[in-house]
């Protein structure tokens, strides 16, 4: 993967003509395509394989092909690509040869956000859930925001919406610096930690990129920073120097919007929020985990800065049931509950397992972890292993390569060897097809199984449930 280039001024969305997406099934790409379709633009695209996203976009009028062929770009005016597309893709090359406008995904996102009051949610962890919560809170306030999110909201079942209100909420991707193409009025930064080091090269470069992101916020704008994370707190001086209004949120005693009296349970959480010494009132969530309470506090902090009524935000957040692949329940078989989570960074993994511990309510937590990317596994194997120590039983799968080529010596075994549990509680299982039977053999009634990772581990939930049903009583 490489960094996106600043392509300069991008035409307004209604001047892009027919837009062709290479990799249209991706979370970010499909959301933008959905909004363009809602605005009446002709959209086409391709992807490597069929998916639920492709089916949904076809139903909205998109012309979508499976596979990559230069002929697919015929008739297009603008081609959209992303960092997930390998250099030399035949459709991208054909578009360049034909002199078509070729734009990175984030440039088109910036184009569709133009004219709205843009709000960007950035951070190493928690972006998708926080963006989703913010969209729901704005809806509860009667604002009907547009939004583009890296995951499907459970209620509408989609990752994007072309609203009639003034706000446009977007998940801002730091992995390839594409968030530096956005120009929001306001932003939330959940946390800042080293990640995507295959791209950035160093932790300092990651922090520098987030400081540069502050420079993209409109003059006189607002930034809301996570108070519990050193990386995001460290952005406050730079934000103030830019003249931005700065608010913080979290559990920290000095947070501008502070969580007080947090009570966690299998059913979610209950707490009060305090802002400037004033108690705003109670807030309850049905999504589990301390991290989700913190995410909600960030949403409220930004909402207050925008002048939104707390009571309406609290009502919306109380009804928020989550986003797809964010601690998503997959089912139950023989007394064993199965959940799925997208966590692919040590901090996200720790948060997911902490939530699992509360939801398990005394039962054992069985973690099924698939490392994502060879580079990330190499960089964080020890941290992943340490985080997995919060489970009772651990099954580590082999690395999901995604866009990367294999790296000698880098396998899931590196993670398994770093888990601080007895050897009998940790298993390295490189065969994807063997995992369901392995998990069914380990789990017992009352256990909670959590499949974890950004790869195809998400497809294991139904397989594990079937294996549990088929297991001898």
Which role does the model predict for each range below?
Residues 91-100, 205, 216-221, 242-244, ...:
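P-loop/Walker A phosphate-binding loop and immediately adjacent motor/lid segment at beta-alpha junctions
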Residues 385-445:
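C-terminal helical cap/extension that packs against the catalytic core
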Residues 3-20, 28, 34-39, 180, ...:
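Nucleotide phosphate-binding/pyrophosphate-handling subdomain across enzymes
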Residues 218-223, 361-362, 390, 445-446:
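Short glycine-dipeptide loop
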Residues 41-48, 222-227, 366-370, 390-401:
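Short internal beta-strands
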Residues 35-38, 58, 72, 83-227, ...:
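Phosphate-binding loop of NTP-binding sites
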Residues 46-47, 65-68, 103-110, 148-151, ...:
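Beta-strand->loop->alpha-helix junctions that form or flank phosphate-binding loops
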Residues 1-108, 230, 255, 280, ...:
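N-terminal leader/targeting and accessory segments in enzymes
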């Amino acid at each position: 993967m490489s960094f996106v280039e600043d392509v300069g001024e991008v035409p307004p969305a209604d001047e892009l003509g027919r837009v062709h997406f290479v990799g249209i099934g991706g979370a970010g790409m499909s959301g933008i395509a959905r909004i363009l379709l809602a605005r009446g633009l002709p959209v086409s695209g391709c992807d490597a394989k069929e998916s639920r996203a492709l089916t949904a976009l076809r139903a909205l009028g998109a012309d979508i092909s499976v596979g990559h062929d230069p002929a697919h770009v015929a008739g297009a005016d603008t081609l959209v690509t992303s960092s997930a597309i390998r250099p030399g893709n035949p459709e991208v090359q054909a578009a360049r040869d034909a002199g078509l406008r070729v734009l990175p995904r984030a440039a088109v996102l910036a184009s569709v956000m133009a004219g709205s009051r843009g709000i960007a949610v950035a951070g190493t962890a928690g972006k998708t859930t926080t963006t989703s919560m913010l969209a729901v809170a704005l809806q509860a306030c009667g604002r009907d925001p547009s939004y583009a999110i890296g995951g499907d909201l459970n209620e509408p079942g989609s990752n994007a919406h072309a609203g009639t209100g003034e706000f446009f909420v977007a998940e801002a991707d730091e992995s390839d610096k594409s968030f530096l193409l956005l120009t929001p009025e306001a932003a939330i930064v959940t946390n800042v930690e080293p990640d995507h080091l295959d791209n950035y090269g160093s932790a300092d470069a990651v922090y520098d990129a987030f400081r540069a992101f502050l420079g993209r916020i409109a003059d006189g704008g607002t930034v809301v920073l996570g108070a519990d994370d050193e990386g995001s707190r460290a952005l406050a001086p730079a934000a103030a120097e830019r003249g931005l209004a700065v608010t913080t949120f979290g559990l920290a005693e000095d947070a501008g919007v502070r969580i007080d009296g947090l009570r966690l349970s299998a059913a979610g959480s209950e707490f009060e929020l305090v802002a400037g010494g004033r108690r705003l009132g109670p807030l309850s969530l049905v999504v589990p985990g301390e991290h989700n309470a913190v995410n909600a506090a960030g949403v409220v902090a930004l909402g207050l800065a925008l002048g939104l009524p707390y009571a309406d935000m609290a009502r919306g957040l109380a009804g928020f049931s989550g986003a797809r692949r964010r601690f998503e329940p997959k089912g139950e078989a023989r007394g064993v509950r199965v959940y799925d989570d997208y966590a692919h960074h040590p901090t996200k993994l720790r948060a997911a397992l902490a939530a699992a511990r509360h939801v398990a309510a005394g039962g054992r937590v069985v973690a099924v972890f698939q490392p994502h990317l060879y580079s990330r596994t190499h960089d964080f194997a020890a941290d992943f292993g340490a985080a997995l120590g919060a489970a009772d039983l651990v099954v580590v799968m082999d690395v999901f390569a995604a866009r990367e080529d294999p790296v000698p010596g880098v396998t899931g075994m590196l993670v398994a060897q770093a888990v601080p549990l007895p050897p009998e509680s940790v298993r390295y299982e490189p065969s994807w097809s063997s995992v369901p039977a392995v998990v069914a053999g380990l789990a017992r009634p009352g256990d909670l199984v959590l499949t974890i990772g950004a790869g195809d581990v998400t497809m294991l939930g139904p397989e594990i449930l079937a294996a549990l049903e088929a297991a001898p009583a």
